Amino acid sequence: ERITPQPLVVQLKLYFERKPDNFGRTLAESLDYGFVCGDVAFLLEAAQFQLLETAVEAICATLLMTPPPDRPSIRPDAVEVSIQKPQALGGKAIPVVTVLRHAKEMQYGIEHNDFGHVDILHENQDCGVYLLHIPAGGQIPAHIHKVMGEAELVMSRGLLLQGQPVDGGIAHLWPLEFVHQYDNPTDTTRTILCVNRPKFDPADEIAVPVPETWPDPRPHRKRFFGLETNLKP
């Protein structure tokens, strides 16, 4: 089962400490469950986890992160993630892994770099999960990876990919040595949820000249949220 992808059943429980009549009236004071569903689906597809245990830990860490500035919401006080693998034992039994994590117990790393900074959400033997912050007017310059697999989920509208607008909720699962560049022409920080396999290695972030013609990213594109959601402009 570590070689062939199998269907999973995921159950999420989000916990909030709230007083009566104090639940918020806008999405910035609540949580958009379309975003939650999209983030989780992206992680499970992009990270190619070999163990249910690492999958649930990565999901917990991502759902409990400080909300991105370009996708404001409240932060859950705790999350419980259960993942079932119905086909793992040929129907004799259904393996289930459940983890409960509280926001107050989470510890996240941060890395400052040339384009902005990165929140290190989770790292394990399979992969790393990161939130890339591109400041207003900033850029992730043209680069490739020769070793790391990489997938990136754009969290809001406003970024340019290869000089063209890319919508929030759109992910790209990049082939090795595929040149890509992001620009942020907006007046606010924009973020990208990034998965590297294995975890990020700065030696494999290889800067390259801007090509005369950008390679087309569309064959590597998939939407995870956005069509049913009011994205922040």
Regions found by a protein language model. Name each.
Residues A136, H145-Q162:
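Glycine- and acidic-residue-biased ligand/ion/polar-headgroup-sensing regions
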Residues H180-D187:
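Asparagine-centered strand-capping/turn motif at beta-strand->loop junctions
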Residues A151, D187-V208:
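A short hydrophobic beta-strand segment most commonly corresponding to one strand
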Residues E1-G116, H122, C127-V129, R197-D201, ...:
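N-terminal, polar/charged subdomain of small-to-medium soluble alpha/beta proteins
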Residues L160-H180:
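Short acidic-glycine-tyrosine-enriched beta hairpin
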Residues V96, V129-H133, A151, A171-L173:
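Conserved hydrophobic/aromatic beta-strand scaffold that supports enzyme active sites
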Residues H122, G128, P135-H143:
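Regulatory nucleotide-sensing modules
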